[in-house]
Amino acid sequence: MYRDNTKVVKIGKCVIGGGNPILIQSMTNTHTEDVAATVAQIKELTKAGCEIIRCTVPTKEAALAIKEIKKQIEIPLVADIHFDYKMAIMAMENGADKIRINPGNIGGTDKIKAVVDVARERNIPIRVGVNSGSLEKDLIEKYGGVTAEGIVESALDKVKIIEDLGYDNLVVSIKSSDVMMCVKAHELIAKQTNHPLHVGITESGTIFSGSIKSSIGLGLILNQGIGDTIRVSLTDDPVREIEAAKLILKTLGLRKGGIEVVSCPTCGRTRINLIDLAGKVEKMVSGYDLDSVSYTHLTLPTILRV
C-alpha cells in the first residue's frame, strides 16, 4: 500500500507515515485568541477521539495564545496560516507542533525561506495545503478548468519550492469539494510523492450531506492504501467530525474499538418505537472504545443488535 511507503513524520508526540495508524484530525471554530474557549473545545474533541488539532492563526494575538493553549492540552497542535508568513514563525516560536501553509499565498521565496529556516531549526513539519478553490489561473488555463491534474501539479510545485530549500519534513494535502475530483487527485499524487498525505473532502457540507460525501470520498481513497491522516469537514459541531471519522475508519477495517449498533429499518410488523430506541442505545454506547467484551471464557464481538 502507498501509506506503507510514505516518509515517517513526527507531529508532537504522534507519528504518521511509514504504515503507522491513520490519525484523526479536526479544527477548532473558536477564536484562537480566546484561550479558555479554545482549550475547552480541544479537550472536548480529545475526549471524542481527536488525535491532532488545527487552529487558525490569523493574528499576532492568536500566535501568542498558542503557548498557553499548549500548556493545557494533550494532543499536537497545528497552526493554520493563510497569508502572513510572520504568523507561521510566531506560531512555531510559541510551540506549534506543525504548521499548515500554502507557499503560494505567503509571498516570495525569501518569506518562504524564513518560515522553512525556523521549521528546520525546531524540526517542525510543514503541511503544504492546496485547495481546488484557489488553483492558479495558469493551471486552470492549462487543463481547461479546475482538474485533478491541476491540483496535483500545484501541490507538487509548492512541495518542490520547500524541498529546493533543503527541507523535506513535509505533509501534503490536496482538497476539493468535488468528491470524484478529490479521489482522482489522490490517486495521481500518491504515485508521485512519498510524503504523508492528509486526506479530506473540503467544505463537504452539513452533517447529513457532508458525512455522506466524506464517507464516499475518504472510503475510496483510504481503501486504496492512500492517506495518513484524515479530517471529515462538517458545518456542525467539530465533535461530529470525530464521530464520523472514527466510523469511516472502523467501517474500512482500519481501526478497531467501540460498539456497533445494528438495527432494523422497521416495517409494518414493528410493535415498538424502534427508531427512538435505536437512537438512545447508540448514544448510550457511543463512549465505549473497547475492541471486544469479555464474558467468562468467551470473547463477544462488539455488535449490538436492536
Per-region residue spans from a language model:
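N-terminal amphipathic alpha-helix/helix-capping segment at the start of soluble metabolic enzymes
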Residues: 1-25
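Active-site mouth loops of central-metabolism enzymes
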Residues: 22-36, 78-81, 140-150, 205-210
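Conserved, mostly hydrophobic/aromatic
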Residues: 24, 80, 128, 172, ...
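Glycine-rich, proline-tolerant flexible connector loops at the mouths of alpha/beta enzymes
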Residues: 47-68, 103-107, 170-177
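Alpha-helix-loop-beta-strand connector modules within alpha/beta enzyme cores
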Residues: 62-79, 118-123, 189-194
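Non-cysteine beta-strand/loop elements that form the S-adenosyl-L-methionine
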Residues: 102, 125-133, 198-199, 255
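Catalytic alpha/beta core domains of metabolic enzymes, predominantly
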Residues: 140-293
